[in-house]
């Protein structure tokens, strides 16, 4: 049956500062989707350690978080282009499964409610001759607070490509990570540290500032799924070109 359906690509972007819970949220959403989803982690597109530049302000520290150089941008753009053209993820190495992850669950009732709603959405689209193909991209954005700093300091060891290990030096979050976030998102907010989204971005993004723990993750999951379903019913996504 699916061979007669037009494939429609839906890419869900989840931004968050380092250790803000974006990857965990992405996995909860993936698990609720009836056909699952492919998750793309921007962390997998970081440069090899030997190509990471040193900070101009702190020349003894490598700067993994400057938005201009934090990932291989041409490779990332090429990967997204291929996904839009084929609906398939090009081969690339991922090390997400090797990184330490603190599990924070979504309340079962909320998860099941959205699982049913997403299944309903899928059937609606099938009835219209459309098969939804899901991708989730998680990358570094969101607000900063002391909890993010403590999480980064607790998770100081990062697995790198192709198999190396990076350990955060002292005060790395304050000197490198947070300034990189500010630089990357100054154009998105009216006052990047405490201000709201700029008007042109408020029409395109959903800003989430949930609490800690299961309650906060449940809120983030709930709001995200609501936005996803509403967006799809309003025509979000793009059709994947067919080949003859």
Region annotations inferred by a language model:
Residues 22:
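Conserved lysine of the Walker
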Residues 59-63, 134, 146-188:
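A glycine- and Lys/Arg-enriched "phosphate-lid" helix/loop adjacent to the NTP-binding pocket
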Residues 2-5, 175-244:
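NTP-dependent small-molecule kinase module
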Residues 112-162:
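ATP-dependent NMP and nucleoside kinases share a basic, alpha-helical "lid"
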Residues 18:
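The conserved Walker
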């Amino acid at each position: 049956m699916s061979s007669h359906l037009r494939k429609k690509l839906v890419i869900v972007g989840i931004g968050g500062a380092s250790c803000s819970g974006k990857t965990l949220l992405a996995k909860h959403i993936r698990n609720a989707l009836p056909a699952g989803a492919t998750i793309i982690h921007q962390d997998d597109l970081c440069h090899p350690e030997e190509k990471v530049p040193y900070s101009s302000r702190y020349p003894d520290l490598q700067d993994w978080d400057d938005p201009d150089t934090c990932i291989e941008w041409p490779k990332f753009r090429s990967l997204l282009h291929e996904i839009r053209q084929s609906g398939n993820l090009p081969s690339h190495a991922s090390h997400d499964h090797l990184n330490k992850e603190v599990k924070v669950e979504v309340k079962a009732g909320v998860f099941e409610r959205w699982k049913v709603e997403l299944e309903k959405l899928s059937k609606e689209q099938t009835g219209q001759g459309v098969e939804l193909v899901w991708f989730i991209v998680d990358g570094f954005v969101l607000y900063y607070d002391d909890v993010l700093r403590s999480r980064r300091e607790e998770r100081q060891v990062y697995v790198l490509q192709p198999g190396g290990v990076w350990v955060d030096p002292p005060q790395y979050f304050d000197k490198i990570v947070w300034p990189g976030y500010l630089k990357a998102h100054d154009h998105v907010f009216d006052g990047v540290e405490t201000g709201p989204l700029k008007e042109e971005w408020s029409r395109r993004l959903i800003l989430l500032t949930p609490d800690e723990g299961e309650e906060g993750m449940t809120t983030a999951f709930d709001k995200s799924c609501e936005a996803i379903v509403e967006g799809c019913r309003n025509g979000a996504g793009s059709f994947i070109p067919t080949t003859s």
